Amino acid sequence: MNSLKKDYRKLYHIQDKFLSWWGNLGLPFYLTGGTALGRFYLNHRCSEDLDFFVNRDPFFPRYIEEIKNAIERHFRVNLQQALFTDDFSRIFITEDDLSLKIEFVNDVSYRSGNTVSYYFGLLDTPLNILSNKLNAIISRDEPKDIFDIVYIAVNYSFNWQVVFAEAKQKAVINEIDVEERLWNFPLSLLENIDWNIESVDLDYFNRVLRKIADDFLLGNDNSVCIKDSPITEAKPL
């Protein structure tokens, strides 16, 4: 493993403690984002936060109140950094010298496919995560998004036109903009990362990313996949 600046083993220990407790609440949130993908599907990188989504749920404020009332009985919560709005909440729990960020989002109504039942509750799928990542790269420069897109493409088979159609159900995006973000991604952003499991071959990564950009723009089948693993049939580890 790469020499890590953060102690991900300790962070994962805190994550595991939270997820074990979380499973008893029975709330309809599903774990998504980099932690869902990295810890429970691909094991391709480390992820320090927990992101939980529901989809346009009118009871979101009620869920957050339930979480707030229960979490302080089991964890040390940093309320000074907490944030609560109508459709978004952020909570930090601390243990020793580490802080775990947990975010709750009342997302748009559409999602790609169904969630997966897992030991801690509901887990997102690579297809929905990928369609979210396409939207994310338009609005932010986050190397983890590109890293995740590449690893999803290498590990699962799918058609890019189908995935883009899923992404457009959630936001107004243009395929030219997505292709440009993929093609012009600055590889220098991957030079000093501390969350990769294995070292990154930048030349290989760039070749794969350029092929992904071409496949995406043409609406082709994903040609960089090295496995016979349809993304719609993806199973957690």
Segments (PLM) and residue ranges:
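Compositionally biased terminal segments of proteins
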Residues: 1-237
